[in-house]
A protein has these predicted regions:
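Long, charged/polar, low-complexity intrinsically disordered N-terminal extensions
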Residues: 1-52, 63
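Compact alpha/beta protein-protein interaction domains typified by the UBC
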Residues: 32, 36-103, 113-114
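Glycine-centered motif in EGF-like
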Residues: 2-19, 77, 83-144
Length: 146
């Protein structure tokens, strides 16, 4: 029996196709397999992902762009590969995930390309500050916020 598609499936497929030319091709992003997604992020659930490399703040960096199952209604995530040792950089989780937004942050599902571009820019800015040691005080602020 053929798989039925919901409106959300169609929106996901449409949003991914919109990312192809302006972002994924430009970054020369390599698709991640479902096995890679489950292996690298066993405590999280992503529907699709891509890996790309670049120089950020003078450091060769590999990032994963990760789309949740309910993208474009939920923002994408970015993961640093390989994950740094814990507490190396502020706003980087143990599995390398970058903390760019608070949980439940609203995104515009009609603008998936703009959402990804903005979060990619935020990821680059965070890593530039981290590599330069400019945001080490954020550890203290994060600790105090809990």
């Amino acid at each position: 029996m053929p798989r039925s598609f919901s409106i959300d499936d169609e929106q996901f497929v449409r949003a991914v196709s919109e990312l192809e030319d302006p972002i994924l091709k430009q970054l020369a992003a390599r698709p991640l397999s479902s096995v890679e997604l489950m292996t690298q992020y066993p405590k999280k659930s992503f529907r699709k992902g891509w890996q790309f490399e670049g120089v950020i703040g003078g450091v060769n960096t590999t990032l994963n762009l990760l789309l949740p199952f309910d993208f474009p209604y939920t923002p994408p995530s970015f993961g640093l590969v390989p994950p740094p040792r814990i507490l190396t950089y502020p706003h980087v989780e143990e599995d390398g995930m970058l903390c760019l937004l608070f949980d439940g942050a609203p995104v515009d599902p009609a603008q998936p390309v703009e959402v990804v571009k903005q979060l990619l820019s935020d990821a680059v800015g965070l890593l530039e500050k981290s590599y330069a040691g400019e945001n080490q005080g954020d550890f203290r602020e994060e600790f105090l916020s809990y």
